[in-house]
Amino acid sequence: ILKIILFVMLYDLKCHRLWWGGDILNKIFGTDGIRGIFNKELTVDLSMKIGKAVAHVLAPNSGKIIIGKDTRLSSDSIECAIASGVCSCGSSAILVGVIPTPGVAYLTRKNRANAGIMISASHNSFEFNGIKIFDRNGYKISDEIQRKIENLIFSDFYDVSFPIGDKVGSIKQEKGYMTQ
């Protein structure tokens, strides 16, 4: 019972919340990005919030974010949600379609994008999906950037203004990126 009191893991549909010594830590990111069962832990709503947060943190002021995906059925829904979130912050979403994870990292750097997002759950079974985020150099984002993204999501974008009119971003399908 004492162990249970000292460490309790609570689970809700969108994130893991760890309680330790009175502090609640909201955590979306795992060891290698964000993963979960589609429409349970990893929802369309959360995916859109991730797109908004990534654009706000890594691509402010009309940046460019490359988005790739694997062939899972849920990847299309997640891609649309992330792209919508990115555009709502004034950045452009460049959809490169089905591509291996290292391809997104490479294209992000080569095309001088502000960030790259890969939708894939790698070796996990089909009901899972995941989101991996790369910085402008094609590297996995740091723990500090992960915390900034999580903080924005859990604050429900408090004190964040969103563009309107011709300042919103656009979605571009760039299938030709695979030949680079």
Question: Model regions: which residues?
Answer:
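Generic structural "secondary-structure junction" signal
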Residues: 31, 36-40, 44, 101, ...
